[in-house]
From Swiss-Prot:
Active site feature: S183
Protein name (record): Phosphatidylserine decarboxylase proenzyme
Function as written in the Swiss-Prot or TrEMBL entry: Catalyzes the formation of phosphatidylethanolamine (PtdEtn) from phosphatidylserine (PtdSer).
Site for Cleavage (non-hydrolytic), residues: G182, S183
Entry comment on modification after translation: Is synthesized initially as an inactive proenzyme. Formation of the active enzyme involves a self-maturation process in which the active site pyruvoyl group is generated from an internal serine residue via an autocatalytic post-translational modification. Two non-identical subunits are generated from the proenzyme in this reaction, and the pyruvate is formed at the N-terminus of the alpha chain, which is derived from the carboxyl end of the proenzyme.
GO MF terms, alphabetically ordered: phosphatidylserine decarboxylase activity
Pathway listed: Phospholipid metabolism; phosphatidylethanolamine biosynthesis; phosphatidylethanolamine from CDP-diacylglycerol: step 2/2
Family recorded in the similarity comment: Belongs to the phosphatidylserine decarboxylase family. PSD-A subfamily.
Catalytic activity: a 1,2-diacyl-sn-glycero-3-phospho-L-serine + H(+) = a 1,2-diacyl-sn-glycero-3-phosphoethanolamine + CO2
Species name: Cupriavidus metallidurans (strain ATCC 43123 / DSM 2839 / NBRC 102507 / CH34) (Ralstonia metallidurans)
Cofactor note: Binds 1 pyruvoyl group covalently per subunit.
GO cellular component: plasma membrane
């Protein structure tokens, strides 16, 4: 299954167009060196909003990474959004990571819940419960098991975008949201899920398997 989205995220088109137009105008009036700082800004905008194709593993028990970044949490804890004990795996995104968020599994959106909050460094544990965040509870299509994905805003990222609704059916690797300029995604899994990543490991959205969750009969 191929990733069916453009190479530049749609969220970035207005920013990229604005930066490019201003750079061209300054280039015309002040020359290359005068416009160089603006061209550098344009390149930064281009790299930030990149959204490259990714391979999507097809193993039925695979729970995929919802975002690019670095693993900062692998632990047993409470899932406050689905009201259960869970295995929590958190992915921290810095400003240089791709910031599209993609579904970790095939399933139905059972619950969406937005929480206003603070904007502390998303690399800190307390960001999970104190920062602005958006929780998506998904019931797996194959066996009804629940996985919760939580978009968490960060110190710089202050805009969470989510494009799905309760009742929507998601496919693994499907793009469902975006967080601008540094953030994290928390994944809550059933406690019998087997993590495939460790703290400090770098992961790629859709391409990296976070954990194995056996299909129940």
């Amino acid at each position: 299954m191929n990733y069916p989205h453009p190479l530049i995220a749609r969220e970035g088109w207005p920013f990229l167009a604005g930066a490019f137009i201003v750079s061209v105008l300054v280039h015309i009036s002040a020359g290359f060196w005068g416009a160089l700082p603006l061209w550098i800004v344009t390149l930064f905008v281009l790299q930030f909003f990149r959204d490259p194709p990714r391979p999507i593993p097809s193993a039925p028990n695979a729970i995929l990474a919802p975002a690019d970044g670095r693993i900062v949490v692998v632990e047993k804890t409470q899932d406050p959004y689905a009201g259960r004990e869970a295995l929590k795996i958190s992915v921290f995104m810095n400003v240089f990571n791709v910031h599209s968020n993609r579904s970790s599994l095939d399933g139905k959106v059972e619950k969406l819940e937005y929480f206003p909050g603070k904007f502390v460094n998303a690399d800190l544990d307390k960001a999970s419960m104190e920062n602005e965040r958006n929780a998506v509870v998904i019931r797996r299509a194959s066996d009804g098991q629940v996985v919760t994905l939580v978009q968490v805003a960060g110190l710089v990222a202050r805009r969470i975008l989510c494009y799905i609704n309760v009742g929507d059916m998601l496919s693994r690797g499907q793009r469902y949201g975006f967080i601008r300029f540094g953030s994290r995604v928390d994944v809550y899994l059933p406690t019998d899920a087997r993590p495939r990543v460790t703290i400090g490991e770098k992961v790629s959205a859709s391409a990296t398997v976070l954990a194995d969750l056996d299909v129940r009969a």
